[in-house]
Amino acid sequence: MAGRKLALKTIDWVSFVEIMPQNQKAIGNALKSWNETFHTRLASLSEKPPAIDWAYYRANVDKPGLVDDFKNKYNALKIPVPEDKYTALVDAEEKEDVKNCAQFVTGSQARVREYEKQLEKIKNMIPFDQMTIDDLNEVFPETKLDKRKYPYWPHQPIENL
């Protein structure tokens, strides 16, 4: 049982080392060696505890009924396995993160297309040293001064200066 559960939770040490900062490599190596030691110890354990030879203890224990009492208590002992409350939450968060990533990728691709259009516009415009103020206002409408709304120089709101 321990071996089967461990197979699901392996660490990709190569990619882990690639993202690790240089000053934390020693800590990462210590973690890797501790993890390997832990895995080998856990793999050496059997799924079920070893069987107890109750006849041997009955023959060697002087007090009558003591071994039977221990046997009954041992057989009645049930160690509860904690229920897994967090895997479902983590899976739900993972699905939500996948959706968020897909939305981000879609939005990023839209921004890239918009930026490519702007880049094409900039590549096709007249060079700045040959451009008049009217050409500049035509290419970049946000640079046009609004003399009707702001009749006094600088012909734009103070906040934009």
From Swiss-Prot:
Q: What keywords were assigned to this record?
A: Acetylation, CF(0), Hydrogen ion transport, Ion transport, Membrane, Mitochondrion, Mitochondrion inner membrane, Transport
| Compartment list | Mitochondrion; Mitochondrion inner membrane
A GO BP term here is:
cellular response to peptide
**An annotated Gene Ontology molecular function:** proton transmembrane transporter activity
Question: Does Iron show up as a keyword for this record?
Answer: no
Q: Which residues carry this modification: N-acetylalanine?
A: A2
Q: Matching Pfam families, A to Z?
A: Mt_ATP-synt_D
The modified positions for N6-acetyllysine read K32, K48, K63, K78, K85, K95, K117, K144, K149
* Modified sites of kind N6-succinyllysine: K78, K85, K95, K144, K149
In the UniProt record, does the keyword Hydrolase occur?
Answer: no
Signal peptide as annotated in the record = none
- Family per record: Belongs to the ATPase d subunit family.
* Chain's role: Subunit d, of the mitochondrial membrane ATP synthase complex (F(1)F(0) ATP synthase or Complex V) that produces ATP from ADP in the presence of a proton gradient across the membrane which is generated by electron transport complexes of the respiratory chain. ATP synthase complex consist of a soluble F(1) head domain - the catalytic core - and a membrane F(1) domain - the membrane proton channel. These two domains are linked by a central stalk rotating inside the F(1) region and a stationary peripheral stalk.
Quaternary organization: Component of the ATP synthase complex composed at least of ATP5F1A/subunit alpha, ATP5F1B/subunit beta, ATP5MC1/subunit c (homooctomer), MT-ATP6/subunit a, MT-ATP8/subunit 8, ATP5ME/subunit e, ATP5MF/subunit f, ATP5MG/subunit g, ATP5MK/subunit k, ATP5MJ/subunit j, ATP5F1C/subunit gamma, ATP5F1D/subunit delta, ATP5F1E/subunit epsilon, ATP5PF/subunit F6, ATP5PB/subunit b, ATP5PD/subunit d, ATP5PO/subunit OSCP.
PANTHER family per the record?
Answer: ATP SYNTHASE SUBUNIT D, MITOCHONDRIAL
Descriptive protein name: ATP synthase peripheral stalk subunit d, mitochondrial
